[in-house]
């Protein structure tokens, strides 16, 4: 099998041309788990097959390290853009990529015949709990905190974009209580094509020493998330800077997560803790 190993900000995947390397559907999960193993395989956060498509320029068929399917990966789709251009599969610099029925649009920057940058329109965040999906009955006494945030928006200076977004949902999960492994946390739910739960850490915690490997799996499999969840642990430095660590469903801790970065900024804006433009430090 021919493959290409690529990463975006350390979020590494194994990329395979699905039109040339034909793997039976029933064997893909097994093959992905073998290839992703960092000791006995190639090693990566998962495998991405790049396939032909009737509705977009290409299809991204993404799998997590554990062999499960995933809907979207911000870093992964950027690498797909570079792959298809650098491998001569297209000469277009404006691309459409479909994954699980959802189309994203890419803009490629090319220098000396090679892609140097890829910009992706990740689309609008999904805040409706049922569509993330989240089961609000599994939270600890859901209080629709977002309604209080809306009613106090004029006094707190909540951004207009946050006010508009929260005004359009029936049940949003913003700063709601959740019990995980005996502890009580505040969580905000966002989907960027895949489900995310954003949790905030105190400023006095050393985020680099935070035991994400112990608590991450408990969030991932919590009953509030019927399709499991990617969990971002965020530390607000100031209104323009956030520290982030991420536990991805099916892959564990990863060095970066593009959809997670987007979801974290959205959540932090909704909570009134940062501006609509900020830098996330991984």
Feature map (PLM): residue ranges:
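A glycine-rich beta-to-alpha transition motif near the start of alpha/beta enzyme domains, typified by
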Residues: 1-114, 197-282
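ATP-dependent small-molecule kinase catalytic core of the GHMP/sugar-kinase superfamily
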Residues: 99-200
């Amino acid at each position: 099998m021919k493959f290409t190993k690529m990463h975006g900000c350390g979020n590494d995947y194994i990329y395979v041309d699905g039109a040339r390397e034909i793997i039976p559907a029933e064997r893909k999960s097994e093959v992905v788990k073998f290839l992703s193993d960092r000791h006995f395989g190639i090693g990566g956060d998962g495998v991405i097959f790049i396939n032909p498509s009737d509705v977009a320029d290409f299809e991204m068929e993404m799998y997590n390290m554990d062999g499960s399917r995933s809907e979207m990966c911000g870093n992964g789709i950027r690498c797909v853009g570079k792959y298809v251009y650098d491998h001569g599969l297209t000469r277009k610099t404006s691309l459409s990529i479909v994954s699980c029925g959802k189309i994203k649009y890419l803009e490629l920057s090319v220098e000396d015949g090679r892609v140097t940058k890829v910009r992706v329109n990740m689309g609008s965040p999904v805040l409706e709990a049922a569509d993330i999906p989240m089961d609000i009955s599994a939270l600890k006494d859901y209080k629709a905190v977002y309604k209080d945030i809306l009613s106090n928006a004029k006094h707190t200076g909540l951004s207009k974009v946050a006010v508009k977004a929260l005004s359009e949902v029936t049940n949003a999960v913003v700063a709601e209580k959740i019990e995980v492994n005996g502890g009580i946390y505040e969580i905000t739910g966002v989907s960027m094509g895949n489900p995310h739960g954003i949790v905030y850490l105190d400023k006095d915690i050393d985020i680099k020493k935070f035991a994400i490997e112990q608590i991450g799996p408990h969030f991932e499999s919590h009953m509030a998330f019927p399709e499991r969840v990617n969990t971002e642990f965020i530390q607000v430095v100031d209104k323009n800077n956030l520290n982030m660590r991420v536990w991805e469903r099916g892959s564990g801790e990863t060095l970066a997560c593009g959809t997670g970065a987007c979801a974290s900024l959205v959540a932090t804006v909704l909570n009134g803790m940062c501006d609509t433009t900020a830098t996330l430090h991984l």
